[in-house]
Curated annotation (Swiss-Prot):
InterPro entries the UniProt entry points to: AN32, Leu-rich_rpt, LRR_dom_sf
Name listed for the protein in its UniProt record: Acidic leucine-rich nuclear phosphoprotein 32 family member E
Positions of the UniProt region annotated as Disordered: 147-256
Lineage of the species this protein comes from: Eukaryota, Metazoa, Chordata, Craniata, Vertebrata
Function: Histone chaperone that specifically mediates the genome-wide removal of histone H2A.Z/H2AZ1 from the nucleosome: removes H2A.Z/H2AZ1 from its normal sites of deposition, especially from enhancer and insulator regions. Not involved in deposition of H2A.Z/H2AZ1 in the nucleosome. May stabilize the evicted H2A.Z/H2AZ1-H2B dimer, thus shifting the equilibrium towards dissociation and the off-chromatin state. Inhibits activity of protein phosphatase 2A (PP2A). Does not inhibit protein phosphatase 1. May play a role in cerebellar development and synaptogenesis.
Positions of LRR repeats: 43-64, 65-87, 89-110
Composition skew (Basic and acidic residues), residue ranges: 236-247
Cellular localization per UniProt: Cytoplasm; Nucleus
Ranges in a coiled coil: none
Domain LRRCT: 123-161
GO molecular function terms listed in the Swiss-Prot or TrEMBL record: histone binding; histone chaperone activity; phosphatase inhibitor activity
Disulphide bridges: none
Length: 256
């Protein structure tokens, strides 16, 4: 795909001045020149044009906010002075896999005052004797060359650093919020307590009901006993009267 078409595709209906990152890797440049990029990409901070067969940076637009520029695996052999003119705030530049052969070509990067990291891996210049010391002497503003500083300490991965920062923030949030599940357990305990209270109330209601039932039954039994006693007394009275009447009846019969 041609570079101009690729740019239109990557925009995704955005205006050029709204874009901060643009990746054009593996598309085809026009005769080794940049095409489709212009000064309207003024908010661009990251631009990648790896393996697009570039031979020249002459048509690179002014990108004053650009911080990172990926130009690996192209055919660039010189003309690096344009970078300081149009991208003065570059901090990272990757020129690995290009046709850079000597220190004179790299000297043009001295005017990139904010440059901290430079990659020249797989360029012929890396075959020079004392290559690393020479580059650090020439470009004293840089900290990392081909991923390592002068003491061979590896450059940190900015994305990993951001992830670690996010993890630390998350840990702090968790610490402030308390151990996970703590509040849930408290809620469960509260719920359990309320359930227990309800159970005790139900049990008390049940006991009081049973006690009332027993008392009522006892009252009924007492009433029954009293009624039975009255009936027995009435029966005894009737029998007594009968016994009294019998002698009288006998006396009457004798008189007869």
């Amino acid at each position: 795909m041609e570079m101009k078409k690729r740019i239109n595709l990557e925009l995704r209906n955005q205006a050029p001045e709204e874009v901060t990152e643009l990746v054009l890797d593996n598309c085809k440049s026009s005769n080794g020149e940049i095409e489709g990029l212009n000064d309207s990409f003024k908010e661009l901070e990251f631009l990648s044009m790896a393996n697009v067969q570039l031979t020249s940076l002459a048509k690179l637009p002014t990108l004053s906010k650009l911080r990172k520029l990926e130009l690996s695996d192209n055919i660039i052999s010189g003309g690096l002075e344009v970078l300081a003119e149009r991208c003065p705030n570059l901090t990272y530049l990757n020129l690995s896999g290009n046709k850079i052969k000597d220190l004179g070509t790299v000297e043009a990067l001295q005017n990139l005052k904010n440059l901290k990291s430079l990659d020249l891996f797989n360029c012929e210049i890396t075959n020079l004797e004392d290559y690393r010391d020479s580059i650090f002497d020439l470009l004293q503003q840089i900290t990392y060359l081909d991923g390592f500083d002068q003491e061979d300490n590896e450059a940190p991965d900015s994305e990993d650093d951001d992830d670690e920062g996010d993890e630390d923030d998350n840990d702090e949030d968790e610490d402030e919020a308390g151990p996970p599940g703590e509040y849930e357990e408290e809620d469960d305990e509260d719920d359990g307590g309320s359930d227990l209270g309800e159970g005790e109330e139900e049990e008390e209601v049940g006991l009081s009901y049973l006690m009332k039932e027993e008392i009522q039954d006892e009252d009924d039994d007492d009433d029954y006993v009293e009624e039975g006693g009255d009936e027995e007394e009435e029966a005894e009275g009737i029998r007594g009267e009968k016994r009294k009447r019998d002698p009288e009846d006998e006396g009457e019969e004798e008189d007869d």
